[in-house]
Amino acid sequence: MSQGQSKKLDVTVEQLRSIYHQFHDILEEKTDLHLPKKEYDDDAVRREVQIQLQEFLLSAMTMASKSLEVVNADTVGKTVKQLIMESQEKYMEPFDLDLNEQVRKMYQEWEDETVKVAQLRQTGPAKINEVYNNSKDEYLAQLDGRIGVLQARMMQQQSADHDDSTDDADDHINWEHIKQDYVASLNELYQTQQDLPKVRYNVEKVKRLMDFLEED
């Protein structure tokens, strides 16, 4: 042991790195046991665990360094932590806190979206059916209203045709009503024809969405 520092244990850089590697290998074995490697390399969970273990091991070795004295001459100016970090690079890329935080957030967002999709698959079909039925009922009610207006106009016209007491002035007024009713009927028919493509499109869109949600 070095004079003046008898309480510290003399070790070489090689011994320090050997200790670190042995601990690292033990932790890796535990990781493989509980988190087996997957077929693809982009395993965010496993990488996060490895990062946490690296930080834990680095912290433990740093605390232990208070009882160690690295005796190699080429380590002048370097701390035990720096030597450990150099050894750490053998196992993984330099630790990037910002990149790791971005990966963690993206993984969390992916998990959140996965939960939302799962919930949508359960509740989506019923909700879509409800919206579709409400829209269908509303459109049919509008059609019934238009048909009712046209029927009322036709009944008024038939009643006017059978009224023998109608004079020439009334005949002129009735013809004006007939013309107005005819124009209104054409407008109603045109509007209905304009609405049909939109209705067909909405029905097809709902059908595609339901097919997607019902997929396994």
Swiss-Prot record:
Q: Which domain of life is it from?
A: Eukaryota
- Tell me which Pfam families the record gives: Mis14
Please provide the Gene Ontology terms (biological process) for this protein. Answer: attachment of spindle microtubules to kinetochore; cell division; chromosome segregation; mitotic sister chromatid segregation
GO CC entries: kinetochore; MIS12/MIND type complex; nucleus; outer kinetochore; spindle pole
Please provide the record's keywords in A-Z order.
Acetylation, Cell cycle, Cell division, Centromere, Chromosome, Kinetochore, Mitosis, Nucleus
Q: Which residues carry this modification: N-acetylserine?
A: 2
Cell compartments where the protein resides: Nucleus; Chromosome, Centromere, Kinetochore
Known function: Acts as an essential component of the kinetochore MIND complex, which is required for the spindle checkpoint and kinetochore integrity. MIND plays a role in establishing a bipolar spindle-kinetochore interaction by joining kinetochore subunits contacting DNA to those contacting microtubules. NSL1 facilitates the attachment of two of the DASH complex components, DAD2 and SPC19, to the kinetochore in a microtubule-dependent manner.
Q: Which PANTHER family match?
A: KINETOCHORE-ASSOCIATED PROTEIN NSL1 HOMOLOG
The remark listed among the other comments is: Present with 3710 molecules/cell in log phase SD medium.
**Complex and partners:** Component of the MIND kinetochore complex, which is composed of at least MTW1, NNF1, NSL1 and DSN1. Interacts with DSN1.
What's the protein here called?
Kinetochore-associated protein NSL1
Q: Which organism is it from?
A: Saccharomyces cerevisiae (strain ATCC 204508 / S288c)
- Chain's gene name: NSL1
